Amino acid sequence: MIIMDYLKILEDLVKIRTDNRIGVKKAFKYLSNLFNNLGIKNTIIEGCFVAYKEKENFDLILNSHIDTVKIQSNFKKDDNNFYGTGVIDAKGNVVLMIHAFLNSNNSLLVISPDEETESNGIYNFCQYLRNKNKIQRGIKCIVGEPTDLNVCIGHKGRFEYIVESFGEARHASSQGLNPIEILSRVILDLKNLPLEKIKVDKIYSSSITPTIIKGGIQSNIIPDYAYVLFDVRSVEKDIIKKIDDFLSQKNYSKHIKSSLNPERHYANFYMLENKELINKLSKHFKISFFNATCEAYYFNKFLKADTIIYGVGKLELAHSKEEYLNLNDFDRGIKEVEKLAELMIE
């Protein structure tokens, strides 16, 4: 077993601000120096940091992401906890994956550069592996995210769904087609659209939530255009088609246009279907479902990899000023992730 000062590595990584591309490059340089000092090969492929012992021979991919959301709080620590943006989402879990990699023979470590934004890194990396025919049948993957040390066998899909509405600009005292009023009807109608639910350890539901709305240029002018962006989370397949079909039946349908925000890739709803693997893992770990979205979907879609999500930290603390990592949980995660990696490929 390789002995590492994981708390020092984690502190160093959290102190590198990675809510921007320059910071991500600095963090990857830090990781490269770390592995170079260990005599372990590493490189950058499609923007992802990759460490490997045998580049052509691996049956387990260990993944997490180095980027964070915009900084909510700076790093600090006490005897019990580390605090600050990134300690659980996901640099603490980067360190867990590093430990699993160092203590397994046939694994590949892949760290994403942009999971919180476009997901271009993993999207392109998975296609790179597929196109190079570098994937063995039956490959497995662990994605490091804050799951409170539960093994999550799936995650929600996420989409940015835009509805644009159109009318004619005119004086606010006149009557007629108002794009803002149209969008208010769209929002209320979608709130009443029946959505699916699933049960894993508890009930998880799809959701359609308006998060951005824009329109208008002056208080006394009815605008000719407005739009609303919905954050769509799914525990069902084809939810976008479901929304499209629903809106197409409304009497305002000829005055709206709907589409996905084209500026990013989207991870759809994912659920592990390997019942034998689930049963094996359930003997050692609590089985749950990741109530957000992550990049596990891409490993399954492009590489046909049986993928689970595992890591330290409570999901509800991520992206908040209250983000913290309990050090006892971190120690437990270090021990458990090594066992989890063994179970995935035995």
UniProtKB/Swiss-Prot annotation:
Cofactor(s), names only, from the UniProt record: Zn(2+); Co(2+)
| Disulfide bond entries | none
Residues annotated for Zn(2+) 1 binding in this entry: H65, D89, E145
InterPro entries per UniProt: Bact_exopeptidase_dim_dom (IPR036264), Peptidase_M20 (IPR002933), Peptidase_M20_dimer (IPR011650), Peptidase_M20A (IPR050072)
Q: Which GO terms describe its molecular function?
A: hydrolase activity; metal ion binding
Record has Membrane as a keyword: no
* Top-rank EC class of the record's enzyme: hydrolase
What residues bind Zn(2+) 2, as annotated? D89, E116, H319
Details of cofactor binding: Binds 2 Zn(2+) or Co(2+) ions per subunit.
Q: What is its EC number?
A: 3.-.-.-
Question: Which key words are in the record?
Answer: Cobalt, Hydrolase, Metal-binding, Zinc
Q: Gene3D superfamilies this protein is in?
A: 3.30.70.360, Zn peptidases
Q: Which domain of life is it from?
A: Archaea
Q: Which residues cross the membrane?
A: none
UniProt keyword Membrane present: no
- Pfam family, any one: Peptidase_M20
Q: Which residues form the active site?
A: D67, E115
- Hey, which family's this protein in? Belongs to the peptidase M20A family.
Q: What is this protein called?
A: Uncharacterized metallohydrolase MJ1497
Organism equals Methanocaldococcus jannaschii (strain ATCC 43067 / DSM 2661 / JAL-1 / JCM 10045 / NBRC 100440)
